[in-house]
Swiss-Prot record:
Gene3D superfamilies: 2.40.50.1070, Nucleic acid-binding proteins (2.40.50.140), Vaccinia Virus protein VP39 (3.40.50.150). It comes from Agrobacterium fabrum (strain C58 / ATCC 33970). Its EC number is 2.1.1.-. Signal peptide: none annotated. It holds the Pfam family tRNA_U5-meth_tr. S-adenosyl-L-methionine binds at Q253, F280, E300, D348. [4Fe-4S] cluster binds at C63, C75, C78, C152. InterPro entries: MeTrfase_TrmA_AS, NA-bd_OB-fold, SAM-dependent_MTases_sf, TRAM_dom, U5_MeTrfase_fam. Keywords: 4Fe-4S, Iron, Iron-sulfur, Metal-binding, Methyltransferase, S-adenosyl-L-methionine, Transferase. Belongs to the class I-like SAM-binding methyltransferase superfamily. RNA M5U methyltransferase family. The active site is at C374 (nucleophile). One of its GO terms (biological process) is rRNA base methylation. GO terms for molecular function: 4 iron, 4 sulfur cluster binding; metal ion binding; rRNA (uridine-C5-)-methyltransferase activity. This is Uncharacterized RNA methyltransferase Atu0735.
Length: 416
């Protein structure tokens, strides 16, 4: 380890400040462009020891757990709370612009859709049993160390206010000091708590869990690795006003605000399409909204998610027909011959993107496509495939679903 004073030239894709040293770039978390900082350097990583000259874009973080001086350690949940709003918004938009540019794409890119603090309805916590109880928080960046949190300005107050209840539920299920994960989804009927990383619970633990949950208010369900352990109330969320009970541990957009913004962009482009395919549809985030305007074929690999979607569609009046298909689109994409049945296609894949499916789409005659992605790099790759097939990207909109992190959602609309 060496100590030296450096000047930060730019922000990297992970939100770290980048300094240029004789032996190459050095990445310095929590440092901003234009700042002069003293760092402790190990290989290409720097730790801020002091700030000699601060940037005018620096601001005080809103959370006590943020940064090198955070309470209980440096929480890895956020990396950009110290950056003022305007340059922060520009940074997020540039993540999308630069990813597109790397594939030779220069479509119109909208300003960032801004999401507010306290909107995150789904959070994944790290947890571990200790002598004092249950340690609950987020892992420190690039570390297995769990930073115990007492607040979280990103997460919904409906979750933050129940930290004690979440700890009690986790503690009733765990027998050793191995770390595990607790995913909490705030639903209209209470918290939906999904635990992963614990192999099993015995009969005594089940009884303790049941007693713990029934003594509380506002807990809808507790599950372990997808198995429902107790469900006082069926968890309910709404997709465009349509009630859905998502599967235990299933995927849900992190914030309703971002989901609504993405859905609005999607619906505006799909317009009056009569036959629509929703690929990687999950529990119906977009499919159920689309069914108000046209027939929908919803495709997803997760059986429980499809069943939730199907049940919601069958029990909602006023929707056009919705068909569902269980299918692994990474291995068995909809072929060009199948795609000829649709006027519009919407796809929202995991971070890996939809490369194989896009190769089929590129050869199709589908008039309108909406691509939703949480990874600008794989989105750019997929859009490049589609443009090579004759599609034109008419608009890309970045959405700040992951506040104060280096991650960004984006919606791209295409036509042929």
């Amino acid at each position: 380890m060496s100590t030296q004073t450096v000047t930060i030239k730019s922000l990297g894709a992970q939100g770290d400040g980048i300094a240029h040293c004789p032996d190459g770039p050095v990445y310095v978390p929590f440092a901003l462009p234009g700042e002069t900082v003293a760092i402790a350097k190990v290989k290409d990583q720097g730790t801020v020891m002091s700030i000699t000259e601060a940037s005018a874009d620096r601001r005080d973080p809103v959370c006590r757990h943020f940064g090198p001086e955070g309470i209980n350690g440096t929480c890895g949940g956020c990396s950009l709370q110290h950056l003022a709003d305007q340059p922060y918004h520009a940074f997020k938009r540039e993540l999308v612009v630069s990813a597109l540019r790397s594939k030779g794409l220069t479509p119109p890119v909208d300003d960032l859709v801004i999401c507010r603090p306290g909107e995150r309805r789904r959070a994944v916590f790290a947890a571990r049993k200790t002598e004092k109880g249950l340690l609950l928080g987020f892992s420190q960046a690039n570390s297995h160390h769990i930073v115990a949190i007492e607040e979280c300005p990103v997460t919904s107050p409906g979750i933050v206010s129940r930290f004690d209840a979440i700890r009690a539920i986790g503690l009733s299920m765990v027998a050793n000091a191995e770390p595990f994960r607790i995913t909490v989804l705030e639903t209209l009927s209470g918290l939906d708590i999904s635990v992963e990383g614990i192999k099993s619970v015995n009969d005594k633990q089940r009884r303790t869990l049941t007693e713990t949950v029934l003594a509380m208010r506002g807990i809808a369900r507790v599950s372990l690795s997808g198995e429902i352990l107790i469900e006082p109330q069926k968890p309910i969320i709404e997709f465009g006003g349509i009630p859905v009970s998502p599967p235990a541990g299933g995927f849900t957009q992190a914030t309703k605000q971002a989901e609504d913004a993405m859905a609005e962009l999607m619906l505006a482009h799909v317009g009056k399409s009569k036959r629509i395919a929703d690929l990687f549809c999950g529990s119906g985030t977009f499919a159920l909204r689309l069914a108000r305007i046209g027939r929908v074929h919803a495709v997803e690999a997760e059986d429980k998610a499809l069943k939730a979607l199907d049940f919601a569609a069958r029990n909602t009046q006023g929707l056009k027909p919705v068909s569902v298909e269980k299918r692994d689109l990474f291995r068995r994409p909809l072929m060009t011959s199948e795609l000829k049945n649709y006027d519009a296609v919407v796809f929202d894949p995991p971070r890996a993107g939809a490369e194989v499916q896009c190769k089929e789409l590129a050869r199709s005659t589908v008039k309108k496509i909406v691509a939703v992605s949480c990874n600008p790099l794989t989105l750019a790759r997929d859009l490049a495939i589609l443009t090579e097939g004759g599609y034109r990207v008419t608009r890309v909109t970045p959405v700040d679903q992951f506040l104060w992190s280096p991650h960004v959602e984006a919606v791209a609309v295409l036509e042929k």
